[in-house]
């Protein structure tokens, strides 16, 4: 069942089983071009480094904006890193390495989306088609209304473009990592080193599903929030001797 006749005549297939040469498609459900896009990937990095007789350092910062090939996904990340090693005197050396990152991911393109592109017939429109007027239906703002295809025999109630427009699902990630050490040389070849590491991870997910269209319309939409924090640390002490 098409739900709507996609052709400009009532009987596009004759009694002989052949297509009527006058039959033309009113619309073309071009899901592939709607979902797959050639989009810009931007990545920028900058770094500084230096050293002298007692110390060396390295500092870097980066920005990534990767929209991917699917029009329904976005990813953005800010990151920075700093590394310092310092010889306090002949027998003591200290150092630290710290990295921070903040990223936001919204939308997703799962295996289900790929399978939809492979199997969704083009006779199923992306937007609702009005057979009476031979035009797409418009909302009160003059925008085309997405077709969730509740009449379809496959992919019923599915429209990833509509979900991306009406629903929001941003994931926010924050990561902090630090490695610090001090090293004592007692005699040539005999060293004591203490390493201390700290890792902090946090993510937040804020989901919103609209109340007007899609699977949540029947129960007036939904909203939910999820978050998690994790802090871990490790201390180890090493005594080594090399001839």
Describe each PLM feature range.
Residues 61-67:
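Transmembrane beta-strand segments that form the barrel wall of outer-membrane beta-barrel proteins
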Residues 29, 34-35:
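C-terminal beta-signal and adjacent terminal beta-strands/loops
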Residues 40-46:
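Solvent-exposed "coupling" segments
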Residues 47-49, 60, 83, 179-181, ...:
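Outer-membrane beta-barrel architecture
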Residues 1-27, 38, 68-75, 79-177, ...:
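Surface-exposed loop/interface segments of Gram-negative outer-membrane beta-barrel transport/assembly proteins
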Residues 50-54, 63:
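A generic beta-sheet turn/junction motif
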Residues 58-60, 95:
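Periplasmic plug
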Residues 41, 52-53, 89, 185-189:
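Outer-membrane beta-barrel channels and translocator barrels
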């Amino acid at each position: 069942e098409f739900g709507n006749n996609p052709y400009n005549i009532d009987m596009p297939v004759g009694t002989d089983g052949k297509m009527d040469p006058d039959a033309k498609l009113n619309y073309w459900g071009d899901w592939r071009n709607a979902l797959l896009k050639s989009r810009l990937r931007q990545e920028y990095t900058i770094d500084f480094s230096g050293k002298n007789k007692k110390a060396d350092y390295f500092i870097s910062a980066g920005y990534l904006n990767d929209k991917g090939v699917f029009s329904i996904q976005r990813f953005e990340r800010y990151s920075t890193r700093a590394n310092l090693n310092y010889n306090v005197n002949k027998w003591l050396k200290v150092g630290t390495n710290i990295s921070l990152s903040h990223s936001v991911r919204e939308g997703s393109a799962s295996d289900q989306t790929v399978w939809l592109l492979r199997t969704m017939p083009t006779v199923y429109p992306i937007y609702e088609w009005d057979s009476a007027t031979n035009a797409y239906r418009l909302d009160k703002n003059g925008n085309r209304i997405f077709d969730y295809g509740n009449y379809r025999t496959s992919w019923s109630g599915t429209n990833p473009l509509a979900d991306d427009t009406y629903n929001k699902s941003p994931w926010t990630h924050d990561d902090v990592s630090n490695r610090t050490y001090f090293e004592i040389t007692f005699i040539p070849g005999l060293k004591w080193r203490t390493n201390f590491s700290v890792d902090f991870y946090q993510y937040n997910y804020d989901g919103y599903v609209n109340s007007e269209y899609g699977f949540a319309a029947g129960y007036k939409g939904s909203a939910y929030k999820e978050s998690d924090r994790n802090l871990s640390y490790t201390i180890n002490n090493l005594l080594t001797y090399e001839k």
